[in-house]
Amino acid sequence: MGGIVAATGPGSKAETQPATDGTAVADAGAYAGAPAPPDRVVLELLSPELPWLMAIAFIAGLVDAAVGGGGLIQLPGLFTTLPQHSPAALFGTNKFSSVFGTSAAAWRYARSVRFPWRPVLFAAGAAFAFSFLGATVVSLMPKDAVRPLVLALLVLMLGYTLMKKDFGALHRPRQVGRRELSIALAMGALIGFYDGFFGPGTGSFLIFLFIRFFGLDFLRASAASKVVNLATNIAALSFFVPSGNVLLLFAVPMAAANIGGAVTGTQLALRGGTPVIRKLFVLLVLVLIARMARDTFGH
């Protein structure tokens, strides 16, 4: 007589029960570790959250390409939309999708804007290496101790930018020598460590430092920051992907949307130039200060 195979529990033997239609039907999904059936995969692909997450990814890519700070939009969107998933999986999904948008923005900027490649590549190499170090010590240092310092740096950075009306307005690149390359290495190491350990405001800090130490205007500083930010994102993915902490069913469509936003944001930045990017930069830093103040004093 035919029967239906059902698992009574993890590791238990299957029990055979009579089938009402006289046939033997195997319930493959009853076994622990069985792959999800195709219809379930389709349902996840058609998840009602996906269009919303793609819209968030598009906006994040647009903002990030122009002035940085896309993570301030995309990461909270993931946490509020997919609260059932682990933080590591959401961080990995955010990095996976954003690395494609950052790549698209870096490529568009590199083809349209000239900036000194040597210090940028030195900074990118150091940032890639030190982002690993930042990620490894993330559990050893309390983040609450870092927030007041970051808040103070953001306030100083905003004050400096507002007081110097010509800050980043003109492109006055400095001659690149050993001193400048040493500064680029130190800058990349600090930013890479910070991005691997903490993260918020990485793009804003990079733009500020490229203007302050290399004489770039806002447009070229934003372009240079994308190359360094791309290095830190790739380093982060080398942690998240091997450990399986990327929700590919969401990450891949979000990556496509992020690319679309990045292309749009880059085009807006190139058309608007330094004045537009400066205004967006000040606005973004204000948002960062408000968020950091809330996290620091809101407990």
Tell me the role of every PLM-derived stretch.
Residues A55, I59, F100-S103, G125, ...:
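Lipid-exposed faces of alpha-helical membrane segments in multi-pass integral membrane proteins
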Residues L133, L190-F198, A236-G244, A251, ...:
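Hydrophobic alpha-helical transmembrane segments in multi-pass integral membrane proteins
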Residues G92-A145, N233-V276:
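Selective hydrophobic functional segments
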Residues I4, A36-S86, H171-S222, V252:
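Selected transmembrane alpha-helices and immediately adjacent juxtamembrane segments
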Residues A6, P10-P51, H299:
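Short, strongly hydrophobic alpha-helical membrane anchors
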Residues P116-A126, R174-E180, A223-V228, V276-V282:
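Cytoplasmic-side transmembrane-helix entry/capping segments in multi-pass membrane proteins
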Residues H85-N94, R118-F122, G215-K226:
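Membrane-interface alpha-helices at helix entry/exit sites of multi-pass transporters
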Residues A104-R114, A135, L151-V176, V287-H299:
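Transmembrane helix exit motif
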